[in-house]
Amino acid sequence: MDPYKVIIRPVITDKAISLIEKENKLTFIVDRRATKQDIKRAIEEIFNVKVEKVNTLITPKGEKKAYVKLKPEYSASEIAARLGLF
């Protein structure tokens, strides 16, 4: 699956910003057909970082949300700044 089709958009909520600052996690809405491996590969390729783990859930709206924890040597705050979240 094309990495740019896997990631639909970042999530910008108070909880998502808190996760960026406290747990080094980014939150994205992703394609519903994407697997955790697809999401990990897409994030690593697009943002040039290493991913520690990916947690996913389906929202009541029917969207798939992914919580992506980066390895400690990478900063979620820097990625968020590049995305224009800060």
Swiss-Prot record:
Single GO term (MF): rRNA binding
Cellular-component GO terms for this entry: ribonucleoprotein complex; ribosome
Family: Belongs to the universal ribosomal protein uL23 family.
Role noted for this protein: Binds to 23S rRNA. One of the proteins that surrounds the polypeptide exit tunnel on the outside of the ribosome.
Keywords noted in UniProt: Ribonucleoprotein, Ribosomal protein, RNA-binding, rRNA-binding
Species for this entry: Pyrococcus abyssi (strain GE5 / Orsay)
Assembly with partners or alone: Part of the 50S ribosomal subunit. Contacts protein L29.
SUPFAM superfamilies named among the record's database cross-references: Ribosomal proteins S24e, L23 and L15e
InterPro entries noted in UniProt: Nucleotide-bd_a/b_plait_sf, Ribosomal_uL23, Ribosomal_uL23-like, Ribosomal_uL23/eL15/eS24_sf, Ribosomal_uL23_CS
Residue ranges crossing the lipid bilayer per the database entry: none
GO biological process, one term: translation
Name of the featured protein: Large ribosomal subunit protein uL23
Pfam families (UniProt xref): Ribosomal_L23
